[in-house]
Design a protein with these regions (language model features):
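Residues at alpha-helix caps and immediate loop-helix transition turns in enzyme cores, especially N-
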Residues: 52, 84-85, 146, 206, ...
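Acidic/His- and Gly-rich active-site-bordering loop/insert found
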Residues: 1-42, 51-54, 58-67
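Metal-dependent amide/peptide-bond hydrolase catalytic core
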Residues: 151-322
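Hydrophobic/aromatic beta-strand patches that form the interior of the parallel beta-sheet core
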Residues: 14, 73, 101-103, 251, ...
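Non-cysteine beta-strand/loop elements that form the S-adenosyl-L-methionine
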Residues: 15-17, 130-132, 280-286
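Structural signature of FAD isoalloxazine-binding scaffolds in flavoprotein oxidoreductases
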Residues: 17, 52, 104, 126, ...
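Histidine/acidic-residue-rich, glycine-tolerant segments that coordinate divalent metal ions
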Residues: 23-25, 30-41, 47-48, 65-175, ...
Length: 322
């Protein structure tokens, strides 16, 4: 949704982004706004993100006191690769504009209702999806000399992958499938998980180490491992000047502000950070809201008022200053 109130030659612009996709969770909340679709709910606050952005745009539509062009971006596909942000940018909707900032927010139960959270520089991790299919020769569990055991190879692979964890890397395997039985070794096993990093160089190094580990295990166990690394979202890196401006504005508006720690979770907002000055901040909804990605998550609606007021004020500051 694009609004413009400026002479044709003024190309200044600001982009306000809200993600809008839901999650495959059956909602257990008993409220007026609960999901009407079984097995799907807004378990991560994206409905509140959309409500805040809608409120900002509605306010500007009634009193368009900004200069330049304001983009209201309701973005799908944040929760899964390749990320809706990458698909939006592939269409080049902001080409020819002087984009002063791409701004996004996310609800945060660990902050009090209405509190705003900021972090300059690196904020959220890059994320990749890992898949491994280890193929060997199965058979009777008593005849091990006749086997090329994919379970043993897979167990060693899992152990060595987890050993990669450190300050610059968070690697988890969340799914293992093998089949077989007490006396049957299967022909193959399957594993999948995620890799999260904060440095592009380190990201590439770990990708190569994963391939080397798999090849070494193949050689010693006589198996063949198919490694698939699905490159996902880049790091969310907040523009330091924008963080200073936003923090000062929030304090001037008498809002409570907290500085945020580095997070190992990921967000496709990182794609915007690679192309434009960007700011991704947190909107407190209180601990009583519950935990995101659960069937009872319900952000406190009182945060919406703060969310609208701050995002509107920030957009005005970005567009109206020379």
């Amino acid at each position: 949704i694009k609004g413009r109130k400026t002479p044709e030659g003024d190309r200044r612009a600001a982009v306000l982004r809200a993600d809008i996709d839901a999650l495959p969770v059956t909602e257990r909340n008993d409220c007026e706004w609960r999901s009407q679709n079984e097995g799907v709910m807004h378990a991560c606050g994206h409905d509140m993100h959309a409500a805040v952005l809608f409120g900002v745009l509605k306010t500007f539509a009634e009193a368009p006191d900004f200069r330049g062009t304001l983009f209201g971006l309701f973005q799908p596909g944040e929760e899964c690769n390749p990320g809706g942000a990458s698909l939006v940018l592939a269409e080049k909707p902001f080409e020819g504009y002087d984009v002063r900032a791409v701004v996004g927010e996310h609800v945060e139960p660990q902050l009090e209702v209405g509190t705003l959270g900021f972090r300059a520089g690196k904020y959220m991790a890059a994320s990749d999806e890992l898949r491994f299919r280890v193929r060997g020769t199965g058979g009777h569990g008593a005849m091990r000399k006749q086997l090329k055991d994919p379970v043993a190879a897979g167990a060693e692979l899992l152990t060595r992958l987890i050993a990669l964890n450190g300050e610059e890397c968070v690697l988890s395997i969340g799914r293992v499938e093998a089949g077989g039985a007490t006396n049957i070794v299967p022909d193959e096993i399957y594993m999948e998980g995620t890799l999260r990093t904060f440095d592009e160089r380190e990201r590439g190094i770990i990708h190569r180490r994963i391939e080397i580990i798999a090849a070494d295990i193949d050689a010693r166990h006589g198996v063949k491992t198919e490694v698939t690394i699905g490159r996902g979202y880049p790091c969310v890196v907040n523009d330091e000047i924008l963080v200073k401006q936003a923090t000062a504005l929030a304090k001037a508006e008498k809002l409570k502000v907290e500085m945020l720690p580095l997070r190992t979770t990921a967000e496709d907002f990182g794609f915007y950070c690679k192309q434009y000055p960007s700011l991704f901040y947190r909107l407190g909804v209180g601990a009583a809201s519950g935990k995101p990605h659960t069937s009872t998550f319900s952000p406190d609606e009182k945060a919406i008022t703060t969310g609208i007021a701050f995002m509107q004020a920030l957009a005005l500051k970005l567009l109206n200053e020379k």
